Amino acid sequence: MTAIPLTFYLGLAALLFSIGLYGVMTHKSGIRLIMCIELMLNSANLNLVAFSSYTDTLHGQVFAMFSIALAAAEAAVGFAIFMAIYRMHDKINLDELNILRW
């Protein structure tokens, strides 16, 4: 069985990060924005796991697990905020909302 080269993982992670960055810059919906940020975080996790598997250490995989847990908590808080905003204003368009400004 042949191993997949590291450049394939790095290229895939760069592609996923680019798609997520494009989504962050173009989407106005809050839920789509969180999904694109999660895609960018997952591409960083893919890099961590790929480098970890090629150096035969578990440091990158452990850090990726903590990053996944942190991303899940961030998504839960973000979705809760967006649900509260939706209940108050019946929309989640980020350009029109300025609730969190001082």
Curated annotation (Swiss-Prot):
Optimum pH is 8.5. The chain crosses the membrane at residues 4-24, 33-53, 62-82. Pfam families: Oxidored_q2 (PF00420). Its main location: membrane. It comes from the Archaea. Keywords: Cell membrane, Electron transport, Membrane, Methanogenesis, Methanol utilization, Oxidoreductase, Transmembrane, Transmembrane helix, Transport. One of its GO terms (cellular component) is plasma membrane. GO terms for molecular function: Methanosarcina-phenazine hydrogenase activity; oxidoreductase activity, acting on NAD(P)H; reduced coenzyme F420 dehydrogenase activity. Disulfide bonds: none annotated. NCBIfam families: F420_dehyd_FpoK, PRK05715.1-2, PRK05715.1-3, PRK05715.1-5. Component of the F(420)H(2) dehydrogenase (FPO complex) which is part of the energy-conserving F(420)H(2):heterodisulfide oxidoreductase system. The membrane-bound electron transfer system of the complex plays an important role in the metabolism of methylotrophic methanogens when the organisms grow on methanol or methylamines. Catalyzes the oxidation of methanophenazine to dihydromethanophenazine. It shuttles electrons from F(420)H(2), via FAD and iron-sulfur (Fe-S) centers, to methanophenazine (an electron carrier in the membrane). This is F(420)H(2) dehydrogenase subunit K. It comes from Methanosarcina mazei (strain ATCC BAA-159 / DSM 3647 / Goe1 / Go1 / JCM 11833 / OCM 88).
